[in-house]
Structure formats: C-alpha cells, structure tokens
Curated annotation (Swiss-Prot):
Cellular-component GO terms for this entry: cytoplasm
Gene field: nfi
Organism the protein comes from: Gloeobacter violaceus (strain ATCC 29082 / PCC 7421)
Pfam families listed in its UniProt record: Endonuclease_5
CDD domains linked to this entry: Endonuclease_V
Descriptive protein name: Endonuclease V
Amino acid sequence: MSVPNEPDSSLAMHSWNLTPQQAIEVQKQLAVQTVRTGNPEGVQRVAGVDVSFNPREPKALVHAVVVVLSYPGLEVVDRQAVSAAVDFPYIPGLLSFREAPPILAAIGQLSQKPDLVIVDGHGYAHPRRLGIASHLGLFLDLPTIGCAKSILVGRADGDLAEAAGSLTDLLWRGEVVGRAVRTRSRVQPVYVSPGHRLGLDSAVEWVLRCCRGYRLPEPTRQAHNYSNLVRKARQPISLNGLSGAK
C-alpha cells in the first residue's frame, strides 16, 4: 500500500506522545476492542514484523522492518524498513509505544498489502491483554498474530513434547492466553497468541503453516534477519509525515 497524503483514520486511533501511565490507560481502553475469533480466508500474502535496537546506541534508535511473503509459496515479495530515534522509554508491557510508530511507517511504504501479519512479540498474552500484535491489528484492521521468543506473562500448562508441532496452553490468572508451540524438534518453543481478528487455534495453525524447519515462522524469521541488517547499516529518519506514525 502506498503512503497516502493524509493518514487513514484507522491509523490515527490515539496519540503516541504519552506518558507511561497514559499508555497503560490506552491499553486498557483498546484491549476490549480486539476481536479474538475467526480465521483469515483467501490469504495470498503474509507479513512478518520485527524490531531491533542496540541498547548502547546513544540515540535509542529503533529499527523496524516488515517483510511480505507470498502464501503458500513463502517467497519474499516486498520489504520495508524505518530506523528512527524514539523518546518513549523501554518498559516491558509497553513496547508498542516505542515500536509501533516506526513499524506503521514501514508498513505504510509497502507496495503490496498483507492479508495477515505475524509479529515478533505478544498479542493477548500480555498483562493488559494488548500486546504489540493486538495494538497493530487494531490500527491496521488486519488479522495479526503474536509470535514471541519468550514468555511475558503466564506459564506453560504442563510439559511440552519434544516433537515439532507439539503444543501446550499458556495460562495466566486462570485463563488460556496463548500457547507454547514447538516449531522444530528439540528446539525451544515460540509463544503464540492472537492479536486481532482471529482465534487462538487459527493463530497456532497459521504459525505452523508458515514454518520451514526453523524455530521462527518464515515471515518473522525473514523480518528478524532483515532487521539485523538494517540495524548495522541504516541511519535514523524523522517519522513526521510517514503513514501510520502519527
């Protein structure tokens, strides 16, 4: 999708210029708007989103990338990156207020719109049920999945078998908020939760469909690799005027 002259209303749900306490209140308000049912149909393009940064960088640069893959072929058809200095502090549970503006700016530069987005991060498995995958899903009005490398809240409900495709629920405060998913035999699992416009079962199915023998599903694996390249090479830009960065 090309960058519009004026931001789409779906990309202007709230200001990003917030204090941490204000950000928490926004999360509480938005969490009730997420839809955790359904299964995307007619998917032809799946995007992976990842962010990298170097904590030793004095300007706190965030390097956000989106990589779009064909489906079911899983070949890269588009990718974009935005590197920008951000002011919001690094606070677990509030990372979307640091990372979403450059992510949305990168997505706004795509020539091919994805039908489904897999985010390196959490969705419903979040202290206020609004991880970055859920937050992005609401802004983009697209089905989104959180696929994280570590647990933010909760614990696995029992042992997870070593075989690829093994699953166990992720429980927090008596509720199933996600699943631990073994995507490769005898390798650490990923932690999957719905972001927006699909259910947990569908989120897990899509992650497994997008795997190619690595721990990470191919969309976020490609995004992870690209974000590291960008981190080593890119210079910061201003987010002003870029789609989705308001």
